[in-house]
């Protein structure tokens, strides 16, 4: 009797085949997994994580060129350290210290940005320099357009070719014209136009393997003008006593000390 009822039920309510059950389970799984994959992919795209990081350094007295996979070209001044981070939807360079020239290949969907501490430089297809001095950075535009902003400093500031700004946390100077000869550092020529001695020594330190120390801070504002060979920093230091009331003394540890002339 039971067998008859079982057979009747099977005829009225046929069981799906094993293949059909497998397809049905697969369909339900796909309905669950695909949205999760979409949510995950969207989250990754928004977060824009770095999937590749390269560390580059130039030695004292060395200028180093780097060509990126996207066709952009970087030139590191002496004593410079930076990181190139390739993100999913952006390109980012972190300037840790020193100066670099950026010649950027434009990409609409993968913007290029340089970070120097709290200073952010956004590229719009350009050639520009960023010189980081601790918390202070100088951004100089030679061709194209860049936008500069600082953490806690309000809206982005756009530069025109031949302009520069000084930027630090919470502060961004108005754009000002820059001497075109300042671009010659890429060819090993240092152009100083009434530049404070303290700043000159900071630049020369990139090209000199021994510490250069300004013993008397009062001498820091003294102005230096001229065009010098970056690869001959020792000669530049030897010339300073001829144009300024200073003297250069070599200490027992080999460091060079500038002090007021006796």
Language-model features: where?
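A residue-level detector for the "anchor" residue at the start of short, highly conserved motifs
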Residues: 10-262
């Amino acid at each position: 009797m039971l067998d008859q009822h079982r057979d009747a039920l099977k005829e009225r309510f046929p069981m799906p085949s094993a293949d059909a059950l497998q397809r049905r389970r697969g369909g339900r799984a796909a309905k669950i997994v695909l949205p999760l994959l979409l949510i995950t992919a969207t989250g990754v795209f928004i977060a824009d994580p770095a999937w590749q990081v390269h560390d580059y350094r130039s030695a004292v007295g060395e200028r180093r060129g780097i060509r990126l996979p996207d066709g952009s070209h970087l030139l590191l001044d002496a004593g410079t350290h930076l990181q190139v981070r390739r993100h999913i939807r952006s390109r980012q360079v972190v300037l840790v210290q020193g100066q670099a020239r950026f010649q950027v290949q434009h990409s609409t969907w993968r913007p290029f940005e340089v970070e120097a501490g709290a200073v952010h430089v956004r590229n719009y297809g350009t050639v520009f320099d960023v010189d980081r001095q601790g918390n202070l950075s100088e951004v100089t535009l030679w061709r194209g357009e860049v936008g500069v902003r600082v953490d806690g400093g309000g809206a982005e500031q756009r530069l025109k070719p031949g302009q520069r700004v000084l930027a630090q946390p919470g502060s961004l100077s108005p754009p000002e014209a820059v001497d075109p000869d300042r671009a010659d550092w890429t060819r090993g020529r240092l152009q100083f136009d009434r530049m404070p001695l303290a700043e000159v020594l900071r630049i020369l330190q990139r090209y000199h393997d021994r510490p250069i120390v300004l013993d008397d801070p009062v001498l820091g504002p003294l102005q230096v003008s001229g065009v010098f060979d970056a690869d001959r920093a020792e000669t530049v230091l030897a010339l300073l006593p001829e144009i300024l009331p200073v003297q250069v003394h070599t200490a027992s540890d080999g460091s060079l000390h500038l002090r007021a002339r006796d």
